[in-house]
Amino acid sequence: MATAVGRLVLRRPGAGGGARWRFIATSPAAELSPTELTEMRNDLFNREKSRQLSLTPRTEKIEVKHVGKTDPGTVFVMNKNISTPYSCAMHLSEWYCSKSILALVDGQPWDMYKPLTKSCEIKFLTFKDPDPKEVNKAYWRSCAMMLGCVIERAFKDDYVVSLVRAPEVPVIAGAFCYDVTLDKRLDEWMPTKENLRSFTKDAHALIYRDLPFETLDVDARVALEIFQHNKYKVDFIEEKASQNPERIVKLHRIGDFIDVSEGPLIPRTSVCFQYEVSAVHNLNPSQPNLIRRFQGLSLPTHLRAQFTIWDKLVERSRKMVTEDEVRQTENTESTQ
């Protein structure tokens, strides 16, 4: 499938791995195609995941106490560093499995598929809770990561796409976003309605695949190796690593797309229902490296909107998310 953009063509990359190679840490990005970079990153991710699992060859039991409004006091005997909040939900009911978006583990927001590391208390969070703030933030964050995946894959291997960051923005801003730099040959390109529809279609393909959001905490050294070809991610990793003495960085993966994200994120892509890539804005047209802000809107399957309301929300989401809104969120996070 190809989409024309002026004299350029945007083509969805085909499935498949491509040739194998030897990893050379000093190789410039130009030597690896986007498909090869994806392979390399996943190889390193899988290797680190296997290494971490091998550190606990003997199964150790932990006790997890449920403190929710329903079924309070239920205690699960689970496997340390293997069992997840979703594993606990499976012992309760199908309702918990299908409705839970996040867990609170000893009061801390936690991914549903992130392994539990010690005996703890657990509570499950849903979109219908009296205060869904943490759930909404996780949903927005996850939708932005999906947007990054779509944009990175939408351009054929001939064009370099560098993901910069997914700014934390409040839901009330009306759109989530991902900042991106494109190949210099695309500096004059602005997306048509057909391009936006193509991006949206790719996002719905991710939703249809019902992919889990995997999470992996790694040493900054591992994260830097995975993202060695993206200077923006390298800077972001260094920033995050400097914020904790262990220099631990959180990675997430959907399918074969890996990103740096503090999380927590939603359990699966199928939590999303309505999703649209609605706008692209130029952030710094006077600077040498043009940064584009791709924006989108989504509602989960639990909170669907009628078409007329959805259309109004989409129209609102086209307005550029400003740096003031981004800074407002960052300042709020830093004071909590």
UniProtKB/Swiss-Prot annotation:
SUPFAM superfamilies: TGS-like, ThrRS/AlaRS common domain. One of its GO terms (cellular component) is mitochondrion. It is found in: Mitochondrion. InterPro entries: Beta-grasp_dom_sf (IPR012675), Pro-tRNA_synthetase (IPR050062), TGS (IPR004095), TGS-like (IPR012676), Thr/Ala-tRNA-synth_IIc_edit (IPR018163). Keywords: Acetylation, Mitochondrion, Ribonucleoprotein, Ribosomal protein. The modification N6-acetyllysine is found at K123. Transmembrane segments: none annotated. One of its GO terms (molecular function) is nucleotide binding. Residues 60-126 form the TGS domain. One of its GO terms (biological process) is mitochondrial translation. Component of the mitochondrial ribosome large subunit (39S) which comprises a 16S rRNA and about 50 distinct proteins. Belongs to the mitochondrion-specific ribosomal protein mL39 family. This is Large ribosomal subunit protein mL39. It comes from Mus musculus. The gene is Mrpl39.
